Swiss-Prot record:
Cellular localisation: Nucleus
Name of encoding gene: EED
Subunit structure: Component of the polycomb repressive complex 2 (PRC2) that consists of four core subunits icluding EZH2, EED, SUZ12, and RBBP4, among which EZH2 is the catalytic subunit and which minimally requires EED and SUZ12 for catalysis.
UniProt biased composition (Low complexity): 429-450
SUPFAM superfamilies membership: WD40 repeat-like
Protein name, as recorded: Polycomb protein EED
Swiss-Prot/TrEMBL keywords: Chromatin regulator, Nucleus, Repeat, Repressor, Transcription, Transcription regulation, WD repeat
Amino acid sequence: MPASDSAEWELPRLRTSFIFQDDYKYLGDDGSVSQDLAEFFDVKFYPYSPPGAPPVFAATSKKHAVICRLTQTTDKDANPCEIIQLIRDDGNEANCASCWSKDPITDQPLLCIAGNEGNVKVYNVTEGKLYRTLVGHGGGINDLATSPANPYIIASASDDTTIRIWSLAPEHEKQPCVCILGGEGHSYDLLSVAFHDNGRYVLSAGHDQVINLWALPEFPNEHMEIPIVIYYPHFSSSEIHNNLVDCVAFYGDLILSRACHEDTIVLWRIEGFSSDDPIPGPLDAPTPTDMTKQTRSYFTPTVSPQSRPAMFTRLAQFHTPDCGVQFFMRFRMYHVPGKHPILAFANAKSKTFFWDLARFGEYARFMADLKEAQQSYNGRVVVVDQGQGISLAQAQQVHGPGVGVVMKPAWLVPKRVKKAPGAAGSGSGTAANGGHNNNNNNNNNNNNNNHETGSQRSFSATNNLSNSGRDKESASMVSASPDPDSPFGFSRETLQAWADMYDLSNPVGLIKAHRSLAIDGAFVGRQVGWSPEGEWCVVVGNGNRALIYQRWGKERGLGSGTPGA
């Protein structure tokens, strides 16, 4: 989307939430009810609905799967969430993982659910009945994933240290397990599994701090007497994290992962890996001949025993504070061609974080344009907010050929600082002109409408408010004054705040969230789900609570397409 399309830059805001009253209780050794452990552990949107259809998601607790439909409403007070099906697991299993598939004959939606019993139960959601059960793991299952390339192929990650690849295709009905990823891959319970978009690569991670990448063979379109067993991953490393890894995912050919106690989500790449290259076979995987090596990779061959080329590279770290000792906390990336990739994560202190990865490139472009204009026009530069609806050509015509015009993304909001007692008047506008402001005070006051209110001091959750609609605390807030030592005219506080959120030049720096939203009450986020078209984001967690966030709302009183939101 072009930078001028303000709606595409909008980040989600909380629309509503609900708590599902579960009847699951934990029985102590003496048979007494010791505590209520009701908790949603997983949420997944049905990915096979036709474009424009109301999205459907499943929130999975230990004994239930709650199937909900989300619809646009014209009233901000109307509940957009409707429960359309409720599935109860009456067995002994405490479930924690789910994924979607569909019936290969009827195309009816299927929901796969798994937990500590180690079986994958497949339910026909339309009928609310058990469709079939996949048996084979020797321990509990902690994660499920569906291949983006084939809705009938799913993967399960288990405490038995293996990943099983299952097929729901009719030809594999008698032997649904088509592949086992095990052997020397992992040594302890697995927590996360993810497919590449092409369906031929799988990531796995867990308690042993190891992240593995496996290349899958092509599976025959006929009955298989025994599953294919792959003993070695094509990439393996315990160097990315220093604690158990509870979430891993592909972002294109890049990888996102997080670990307990680290309070970060790491973006990194495997050197030499490209999904465009031929798929390596099982015999191509490197074997652990030297157990002292913490990383081995098929994609970075060692030329000589003395050479130690980098096998992976850290690219960025997204700051997720206040996770504490909690684990089993999952992020989710919304990544659809032609739309902004948005990363979402909820911590253990009732906050949800959002990062729009398209903003990094726009920020770099803006800072480069600003620097170039400063040099080319000897400091005579005017910064125009794109949210004002003025094009670059129009701005250049107004200011003339002797002034450099730089278009600033509307979501780059100058930081506001608390007004000192007795301090005067209004702050500066957004002109960067080497220490003096060519714009008049009326323009400054108009620009301040894009600044944050006092309740939004993270300056990543900005709304384009009028003066009459500001938070009460905003009366004591003014824009940070221009710094004469700054080459860009913005205050040091503003430039630092922008760098903290949008500067990717330091791969070990902590990138603050572009938007951080808090809710009342204690809440530990467990999983995030995105609707297929990106307009809804659902976060589930303890207390069987689901938070429903929305973008591009059409409801009266909610507004739409706020540039800085």
